[in-house]
């Protein structure tokens, strides 16, 4: 029996964040008749500091901190995040309660002049702010110039259209959700550019309150949850933040969980890869096993060098 009549969602103000929050609002109101859901839009530090690469100012956690403070202060009941922005650790009293169904997890190649990444001429300028993409692009195409690109999806597309870049790389999920799929020139296969941990999935964080957890439970997608938990366990075991060249992508194949992961030097000079399979129920164990394979190859040395810079 539901006693709660209303629920407040903390969200960032970017168009994509608002799309995600409205998606969760619509799902909740459809499932729970009579529940009134309101959005509490907030500005985060990551939205304000746009002239500095994320890795230098504390990484993706900057998009989450203010929302978590709103939960802890009781100003909101749940927070909706892109899973790839969610840090590995949660403040005391908060939890990741729900992972919703994943959109396309691949990276999108967006260009007004070229059809694919491999068609770009030598010396072409490619925009991405992600060290994960940077290291994989540099290994694939060491002849390209990779320049930093920050801002929301609309801002990034405008910079491309202004001629600042020959191409930019964005998460396909964001473009699809914003109704901008026509801007996707081509999708980059995961064998060429392995996605970020949690890419394409929406997660819901809340206080550790049974009533709220029950409200959110129907929104969980079991398949996406298993995949993202495996990816995050791998990242956590490597003690990888969001601002390091770590990639991880799991799928369910023939009833088993299949996880691929990599750790790379930012310049693409070395990329370590590992993969593994397990029962779907053993997602977190699989993540740790794959991380161990990377550590045996020397992943910790690459990461220590990055952290010391």
UniProtKB/Swiss-Prot annotation:
HAMAP family, per the entry: Porphobil_deam
Additional record remark: The porphobilinogen subunits are added to the dipyrromethane group.
Top-rank EC class of the record's enzyme: transferase
Family according to the record: Belongs to the HMBS family.
Cofactor requirement: dipyrromethane
Keyword Iron applies: no
Annotated metabolic or biological route of this protein: Porphyrin-containing compound metabolism; protoporphyrin-IX biosynthesis; coproporphyrinogen-III from 5-aminolevulinate: step 2/4
PANTHER family reported for this sequence: PORPHOBILINOGEN DEAMINASE
Gene it is expressed from: hemC
Protein name per its UniProtKB record: Porphobilinogen deaminase
Catalytic function, reaction form: 4 porphobilinogen + H2O = hydroxymethylbilane + 4 NH4(+)
Cofactor remark: Binds 1 dipyrromethane group covalently.
Organism placement in taxonomy: Bacteria, Pseudomonadati, Pseudomonadota, Gammaproteobacteria, Pasteurellales
Keywords: Porphyrin biosynthesis, Transferase
């Amino acid at each position: 029996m539901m006693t709660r009549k209303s629920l407040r969602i903390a969200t960032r103000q970017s168009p994509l964040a608002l799309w995600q929050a409205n998606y969760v609002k619509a799902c909740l109101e459809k499932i729970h008749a009579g529940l009134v859901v309101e959005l509490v839009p907030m500005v985060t530090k990551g939205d304000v500091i746009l002239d500095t690469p994320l890795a230098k100012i504390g990484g993706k956690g900057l998009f989450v901190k203010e929302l978590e403070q709103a939960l802890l202060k009781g100003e909101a009941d749940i927070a909706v995040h892109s899973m790839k922005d969610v840090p590995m650790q949660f403040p005391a009293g908060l939890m990741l309660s729900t992972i919703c169904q994943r959109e396309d997890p691949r990276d999108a190649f967006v260009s007004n002049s070229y059809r694919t990444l491999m068609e770009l001429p030598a010396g072409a300028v490619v925009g991405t702010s992600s060290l994960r993409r940077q290291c994989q692009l540099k290994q694939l195409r060491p002849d390209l110039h990779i320049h930093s690109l920050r801002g929301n999806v609309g801002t990034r597309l405008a910079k491309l259209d202004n001629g600042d870049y020959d191409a930019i790389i964005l998460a396909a999920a964001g473009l699809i959700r914003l109704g901008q799929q026509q801007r996707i020139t081509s999708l980059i296969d995961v064998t060429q550019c392995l996605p970020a941990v949690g890419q394409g999935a929406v997660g819901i964080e809340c206080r550790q309150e049974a009533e709220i957890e029950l409200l959110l439970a129907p929104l969980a997608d079991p398949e996406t949850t298993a995949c993202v938990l495996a990816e995050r366990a791998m990242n956590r075991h490597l003690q990888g933040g969001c601002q390091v060249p770590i990639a991880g992508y799991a799928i369910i194949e023939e009833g088993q969980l299949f996880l691929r992961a990599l750790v790379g030097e930012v310049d693409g000079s070395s990329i370590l890869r590992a993969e593994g399979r397990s029962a779907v129920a053993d997602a977190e164990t699989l993540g740790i096993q794959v991380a161990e394979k990377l550590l045996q190859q020397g992943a910790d040395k690459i990461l220590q060098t990055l952290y010391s810079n």
